[in-house]
Amino acid sequence: MKYIEVDEELYRYIAGKTERIGESASDILRRLLGLSVAEVSEVAPVDISEPGMEHEPVQVREAEPEPVPEVEVAAQTEIDFSDLLSEAGLAAQKGAVGRFLYALECLHQAAPSRFEQVLQIQGRDRLYFATSKEALLKASQSANPKEIGSSGFWVTTNNNTAKKRTILEEALVQLGCDPVRAKSLGELALA
């Protein structure tokens, strides 16, 4: 299996030609091009180098946790959603996937201890978030999982921009954002 990027118009066209649930993009294209839709042996995907998305390994050192007064803990759980995303940070990202990952990384940095709540966000037959690349690939071979910064959380990125926006908005609401502000932030990140 090889991965290619297509623009939004082509994606919508191909998706619009779906005839049955679970039909892959390869099946649709084979049918549209008049090629045999017979079973094709799948080869494990080769990792694609994405220099803008690569992160240096982080060295972790263990430290004794310091007791924190309850008042400070309560203050840290509040997320300032009005200041969550930087327009300059968004503009520096490459494409919708980059902005999607940037927004999720900002959300993780704002509430790292609560971020695991996004694991509850799932589609009818889809898994959007996981704690490993393998879990997303097991759920869908075409998930194109990407790590959210160096958080240890992974997200599927093979959705169209509108679906990415919806997933981001659901993640924001899951972590306490007002739905109206979540929609506004989703549109800012993935207009």
Swiss-Prot record:
GO biological process: negative regulation of DNA-templated DNA replication initiation; regulation of DNA-templated transcription
GO annotation, cellular component aspect: cytoplasm
Annotated compartments: Cytoplasm
Gene Ontology MF term list: DNA binding
Keywords of the record: Cytoplasm, DNA replication inhibitor, DNA-binding
Pfam family, one: SeqA
InterPro entries the UniProt entry points to: Arc_rbn_hlx_hlx, Ribbon_hlx_hlx, SeqA, SeqA_DNA-bd_C, SeqA_DNA-bd_C_sf, SeqA_N
Superkingdom, taxonomy of origin: Bacteria
Region (Interaction with DNA): 96-97
Function recorded in the entry: Negative regulator of replication initiation, which contributes to regulation of DNA replication and ensures that replication initiation occurs exactly once per chromosome per cell cycle. Binds to pairs of hemimethylated GATC sequences in the oriC region, thus preventing assembly of replication proteins and re-initiation at newly replicated origins. Repression is relieved when the region becomes fully methylated.
NCBIfam families reported for this sequence: PRK11187.1
Oligomer status and interactors: Homodimer. Polymerizes to form helical filaments.
Entry-linked HAMAP family: SeqA
Annotated family: Belongs to the SeqA family.
Protein name: Negative modulator of initiation of replication
Organism encoding this protein: Shewanella amazonensis (strain ATCC BAA-1098 / SB2B)
